[in-house]
Amino acid sequence: MLTYKVSPSSVYGNAFIPSSKSHTLRAILWASVAEGKSIIYNYLDSPDTEAMICACKQMGASIKKFPQILEIVGNPLAIFPKYTLIDAGNSGIVLRFMTALACVFSKEITVTGSSQLQRRPMAPLLQALRNFGASFHFSSDKSVLPFTMSGPLRSAYSDVEGSDSQFASALAVACSLAEGPCSFTIIEPKERPWFDLSLWWLEKLHLPYSCSDTTYSFPGSSHPQGFSYHVTGDFSSAAFIAAAALLSKSLQPIRLRNLDILDIQGDKIFFSLMQNLGASIQYDNEEILVFPSSFSGGSIDMDGCIDALPILTVLCCFADSPSHLYNARSAKDKESDRILAITEELQKMGACIQPTHDGLLVNPSPLYGAVLDSHDDHRIAMALTIAALYASGDSRIHNTACVRKTFPNFVQTLNIMEARIEECHDNYSMWSTHKRKVFARESFG
């Protein structure tokens, strides 16, 4: 088991932000169904990327890996051989997108994944695909992985629940490639910036669609062509380094590099949100300058940057006033129930924090070193690491191998910036630290 041992320390200097997971996975998928050769530069090399590559190879795409470059020759037929078993690993995007893609033309395709992936909702997507003609068979009565699916999709209309943007994003892929016209309406759409990211890819590849309010129509039979694409930095990952920079003792701004300020990624909102709370942040070409600065708490709508909930919760512990994070119901259905996970772990550190039905209430409070657990969630692990850097006393964070999902060199990046983090392999032990639990009832009455 990989564990981080974190000693209180401040960060200084500059950081190179890893490439976007969301763009990397979409680029690989579209290149794999395109006609001709595609070149993807600066891709994120991670377990989710490997899961997407393996699935696309099973579909018949030729994928060659070079240092920071993928060369892909697509299979525009987009047909999986009958009885293919797709392993989505621990990737929600691979699970949802490949399920939709396999339903377009293929038959008797089975998808499976990690035990953790089984808790991710699928019913809204599967029901929409049924409305387009797909069929599903489950190996158990629980409607969980693994399951077997068959297409093809027919011209039809469906609505789809909008609680998770990946449902609509997966449908957009399927409806673009299906033989005939298809349309769907998103009911109560959430996480809108991430669906907009999927639409951006359709526009980049000149794949037609039209929209009216929350209804999207696709003529079908679209044929994407090969393309070149340079993956920019991941704003979701940048948020963790930015948080460390805001809390830093540095007298100079900390530069976050490899970021495209014009990119459409959802968690870019994190930076303007922190500016609105008083943080000092500036933009300079492909860099963001974060000045160590104080900031207030506030009422924060999380819908546009749902993946930033764990690190924003940590920052709220250091704010000058209380905070209410709301409209984050979908955070319960990520790699962990992030609302409960971050509450449980930060309470171990002394945080005054209380979960609500769709978010969190946080009162500023000092944090103390503790023995913590990531809940096998990369964003929880990274958020706790930043909290531990600015806590009083050492901390241990167990189950941190999950960080490779989006930020493979997370510890190395922070240590270059003078953080004191040690990676070690151990089991839970009698190792002790100064732990305090300050429960929310004392502060929230």
UniProtKB/Swiss-Prot annotation:
GO terms for molecular function: 3-phosphoshikimate 1-carboxyvinyltransferase activity. It is found in: Cytoplasm. InterPro entries: Enolpyruvate_Tfrase_dom (IPR001986), Enolpyruvate_Tfrase_sf (IPR036968), EPSP_synthase (IPR006264), EPSP_synthase_CS (IPR023193), RNA3'P_cycl/enolpyr_Trfase_a/b (IPR013792). Keywords: Amino-acid biosynthesis, Aromatic amino acid biosynthesis, Cytoplasm, Transferase. Phosphoenolpyruvate binds at residues 21, 92, 120, 166, 338, 379, 405. PROSITE patterns: EPSP_SYNTHASE_1 (PS00104), EPSP_SYNTHASE_2 (PS00885). The keyword Methyltransferase does not apply. GO terms for biological process: amino acid biosynthetic process; aromatic amino acid family biosynthetic process; chorismate biosynthetic process. It catalyses: 3-phosphoshikimate + phosphoenolpyruvate = 5-O-(1-carboxyvinyl)-3-phosphoshikimate + phosphate. GO terms for cellular component: cytoplasm. It is an enzyme of class 2 (transferase). The active site is at residue 307. Its EC number is 2.5.1.19. 3-phosphoshikimate binds at residues 21-22, 26, 165-166, 307, 334. Belongs to the EPSP synthase family. Catalyzes the transfer of the enolpyruvyl moiety of phosphoenolpyruvate (PEP) to the 5-hydroxyl of shikimate-3-phosphate (S3P) to produce enolpyruvyl shikimate-3-phosphate and inorganic phosphate. Monomer. This is 3-phosphoshikimate 1-carboxyvinyltransferase. The gene is aroA.
